Amino acid sequence: MANKPTPEELKNGLSEMQFYVTQHHGTEPPFTGRLLHNKKNGVYHCLVCDAPLFNSQTKYDSGCGWPSFYEPVSAEAIRYLTDNSHGMQRIEIRCGNCDAHLGHVFPDGPQPTGERYCVNSASLSFTDEQNGEQIKG
């Protein structure tokens, strides 16, 4: 897994919530993420390593309180792990490049995939395709 900063660099470069979510499999409170209501066109990247993860065209409002997407930019962008924590059976999603925790994927999304990638804003950055502005979640 390339381009992952050292733990010290991560602690110094991320907010407390960003570090908790990406490095300790945390979850930000619902409806609080900076990128939840972002409607601009562009690409969502991993906050830790800047790998592209999701295109804005695949983002939709699932009503769950976290940014939701119906597919990643590529099969390699996401790593999937079984998560049996908190008495639930879920599929955890991590960055395929640096292994940062992103969120979970559920089989209740819209077509064409039927999947809902439920992602913490704190694990993402967004690059606006119009002006190149980057927004960190």
Curated annotation (Swiss-Prot):
SS bond list:
none
The MsrB domain covers 7-129
**InterPro entries on file:** Met_Sox_Rdtase_MsrB, Met_Sox_Rdtase_MsrB_dom, Mss4-like_sf
Q: List UniProt keywords, sorted A-Z.
A: Metal-binding, Oxidoreductase, Zinc
Gene3D superfamilies xrefs: Peptide methionine sulfoxide reductase
Q: Name one GO cellular component term.
A: cytoplasm
Protein name per the record = Peptide methionine sulfoxide reductase MsrB
GO BP annotations, alphabetical order? protein repair; response to oxidative stress
Q: Which organism is it from?
A: Klebsiella pneumoniae subsp. pneumoniae (strain ATCC 700721 / MGH 78578)
